[in-house]
Amino acid sequence: MTNICDLADRKCKPCEGGVPPLRKEEAENLLKQLEQGWQLADNRISRTFSFKNYYQTMAFVNAVAWVSHQEDHHPDMMVGYNQCRVEYTTHAIGGLSENDFICAAKVDMLLIS
């Protein structure tokens, strides 16, 4: 079975549409390979991360931005004082792709020591 390290080691593939989104069963199987806390709903995956303070929250946001730039796959993020909600979907196909799970795994790896 693939695990978070396997997903995090993969590279996102360019996606410009014309590819069907993942089926629900495929998305559920990939979701099991991520850290707990990720939720699947409305053709997207999301997770809320909590921190001690604003500085730690913003450091996390900047780290996610770096991952996004490296993979050329960008999440929606909602940022508060000590929380950040990260949501992935692949807009070009109107649903989830493997890229969303690859990036989610890379985000999880930011917090694993």
Swiss-Prot record:
Keyword Chaperone carried by entry: no
Broad enzyme group: lyase
Keywords linked to the UniProt accession: Lyase
EC number: 4.2.1.96
MF term (GO), any: 4-alpha-hydroxytetrahydrobiopterin dehydratase activity
Catalytic activity line of the entry: (4aS,6R)-4a-hydroxy-L-erythro-5,6,7,8-tetrahydrobiopterin = (6R)-L-erythro-6,7-dihydrobiopterin + H2O
Biological processes per GO annotation: tetrahydrobiopterin biosynthetic process
InterPro entries in the record: PCD_sf, Pterin_deHydtase
Classification via PANTHER family: PTERIN-4-ALPHA-CARBINOLAMINE DEHYDRATASE
Protein name as catalogued: Putative pterin-4-alpha-carbinolamine dehydratase
